[in-house]
A protein has these predicted regions:
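General structural signal for secondary-structure boundaries
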Residues: 1, 11-12, 83-87
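Alpha-helical transmembrane segments of integral membrane proteins
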Residues: 2-3, 92
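Juxtamembrane or sensor-core-proximal signal-transducing alpha helices
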Residues: 3-36
Length: 172
């Protein structure tokens, strides 16, 4: 009888140890997943930074422009009273702004870096960088609205911007 009781107690102890080990494994697995997610986020941020640096190198007239645009975008998002952005939304705006000029990749260097005034035809090509940028960035899950930032970043509140000449109203 006592042997059976000891066996039951031992089995209960082993089962409890198994449960503890499983809980530890789940915690470790959860920590590993979180670490992988953070690593992926860092990789995406590094990729965005590298691409924006490449853009700045291609366009000699706008060195560091992407970084400044991102900093200004973040500052505006933080201080825009009409819409209180979450920290995550501000981070997305910041990262997206780094790539607002990615469409310039498709602009010929002769047009992009021309020291003289652009002809009407060249200016038309240059203006297309917004649409091309939107096409390049469309569908990026980690920057869901970057394509819109690329397309509309030359629009103006008075409707005199491009590519569509729409009015941008910041107040309701």
């Amino acid at each position: 009888y006592w042997g059976f009781c000891l066996l039951v107690v031992a089995m209960d102890i082993f089962y409890k140890l198994y449960q503890i080990r499983q809980a530890d494994n789940e915690k470790n697995l959860e920590a590993e997943v979180l670490e992988a997610v953070e690593g992926t986020k860092k990789l995406m941020i590094d990729a965005v930074t590298a691409i924006s640096q490449m853009l700045d190198e291609k366009d000699v007239y706008t060195q560091e422009h992407s970084k400044r645009a991102a900093e200004y975008s973040k500052l505006i998002a933080k201080n825009l009273k009409a819409h209180e952005f979450t920290d995550e939304e501000i981070s997305l705006i910041y990262r997206s702004a780094f790539l607002h000029d990615i469409g310039k990749i498709a602009v010929p260097d002769a047009v992009l870096n021309k020291p003289a005034k652009l002809t009407d035809e060249e200016y038309g090509i240059m203006k297309n960088h917004t649409v091309w940028g939107g096409q390049i960035l469309s569908g990026l899950e980690f920057l869901p609205q970057a394509d819109m930032g690329a397309v509309y970043h030359h629009e103006r509140y008075d409707g005199k911007g491009y590519p569509y000449g729409i009015n941008i109203c910041l107040w309701n």
